[in-house]
Curated annotation (Swiss-Prot):
Origin organism lineage: Eukaryota, Metazoa, Chordata, Craniata, Vertebrata
Record topology, Lumenal segments: 97-105, 167-177, 257-264
Source organism per UniProt: Homo sapiens (Human)
Protein known as: Probable proton-coupled zinc antiporter SLC30A3
GO aspect biological process, one term: zinc ion transmembrane transport
Keyword Zinc: yes
Keywords from the UniProt entry: Antiport, Cytoplasmic vesicle, Endosome, Ion transport, Lysosome, Membrane, Metal-binding, Synapse, Synaptosome, Transmembrane, Transmembrane helix, Transport, Zinc, Zinc transport
Amino acid sequence: MEPSPAAGGLETTRLVSPRDRGGAGGSLRLKSLFTEPSEPLPEESKPVEMPFHHCHRDPLPPPGLTPERLHARRQLYAACAVCFVFMAGEVVGGYLAHSLAIMTDAAHLLADVGSMMGSLFSLWLSTRPATRTMTFGWHRSETLGALASVVSLWMVTGILLYLAFVRLLHSDYHIEGGAMLLTASIAVCANLLMAFVLHQAGPPHSHGSRGAEYAPLEEGPEEPLPLGNTSVRAAFVHVLGDLLQSFGVLAASILIYFKPQYKAADPISTFLFSICALGSTAPTLRDVLRILMEGTPRNVGFEPVRDTLLSVPGVRATHELHLWALTLTYHVASAHLAIDSTADPEAVLAEASSRLYSRFGFSSCTLQVEQYQPEMAQCLRCQEPPQA
């Protein structure tokens, strides 16, 4: 094929015999009309981001931490520094005051420091790319970090509950009311500061299913999807639990300061507010278990997704519909679509994928298109799962 003159200065091509060119193998070459002739490309070239997304919803994210995760990391760094400083102060104050409640609060802060350090590590780990072994990447390291945070709080609280029970049985202890009151006041201020730092306020323009706060929907549920970083949420729940206990310790310290004979308020406040701290972990624990058990993402119902797929022209039935979440912000769907023999599979696939992405904010969708068979209505494996 060789260029020949054409109107307007453009080039056209025509077939040429190998004898005319003396080329080997009779291969055909096509020179671009828009670029200067260049050397042939190597046989193996690196893959690049395409200007159009033939099967992907979003452009390829840049390497490293996303803006949402960078924001989460900054939150955790700041909260961890504040937590460590005030933890050291509470250890000293609790020792001087001989207060188990203060030491309890310091132990909770120690658990917070450890959990936030673990969360920072899990955030870094979650940025590692997918491999042939870890095909989904390391997204769930955030969820595992949140689970470790909850478990650590439960363990520390259990130990302190035991110590509070022992103090109630044996009253051979003395409380320094003044030191306890001062330390408890500082602890309340510290926990308020950490709660402010960890408040789930993401960076601007966090759109899409990977946003830090809400995923806007083009259609579908009226309420936005509440999202967030699980590591920051777990740390925030820790701080809320500590804040509740700090208020209880402050109330007990005021009572002991003015009425030293009521020193039993120290272990009693430890007992009561430790239980409150355990209860505060319930929302995070529920989300973690839902993710690890491959449950349907929050605010994404099975029936709405199924009805959306069935509303696509040409789709007769759907089965093998699975919805799950890698994290609170990364939702995945897969399904088989049984279509009419007259339907265009490519058109059905494009329309179904578009509706799932736009209405429910899925990060990844895998759909298999197949011809509808009447036997599917009686097939056991093609039936919908029962209600939970």
